[in-house]
Swiss-Prot record:
Belongs to the complex I subunit 4L family. The lineage of its organism: Bacteria, Pseudomonadati, Pseudomonadota, Gammaproteobacteria, Lysobacterales. Keywords: Cell inner membrane, Cell membrane, Membrane, NAD, Quinone, Translocase, Transmembrane, Transmembrane helix, Transport, Ubiquinone. It is a multi-pass membrane protein. NDH-1 shuttles electrons from NADH, via FMN and iron-sulfur (Fe-S) centers, to quinones in the respiratory chain. The immediate electron acceptor for the enzyme in this species is believed to be ubiquinone. Couples the redox reaction to proton translocation (for every two electrons transferred, four hydrogen ions are translocated across the cytoplasmic membrane), and thus conserves the redox energy in a proton gradient. HAMAP family: NDH1_NuoK. GO terms for biological process: ATP synthesis coupled electron transport. It comes from Xylella fastidiosa (strain 9a5c). This is NADH-quinone oxidoreductase subunit K. It comes from the Bacteria. It is an enzyme of class 7 (translocase).
Amino acid sequence: MISLGHLLVLGAALFCISLAGIFLNRKNVIVLLMSIELMLLAVNVNFIAFSRQLGDTAGQLFVFFILTVAAAEAAIGLAILVTLFRTRHTINVAEVDALKG
C-alpha cells in the first residue's frame, strides 16, 4: 500500500520538476504552459493524499474543481497561443513581450 509519505514525495518531485521547467526554459510558451499544468497536478496529488489520509472526500471533490479550471485554463492558453502564432509567427516569449498600441 502506498503511504502518505510516498505520495507527498511524488507531489514534491512533480512540483520541483515544474519549477525547473519554468525557470530553465523561459523562451517557449508551450513549455511554460505545460509546467504550470504539471504544478497544478502536483497540488492535486497532495490534495488527494491528505484527503485519503484523513478519510475526508472534500479534498477529492476539490481536485475535480481544480481539474475543471485547469482544463479551461489550458484551452484558453492554447487559443491565445494559436492567435499569437498566427499574428507574430513565433511562440518565443522574448519576441512577443512588446505590446503594440
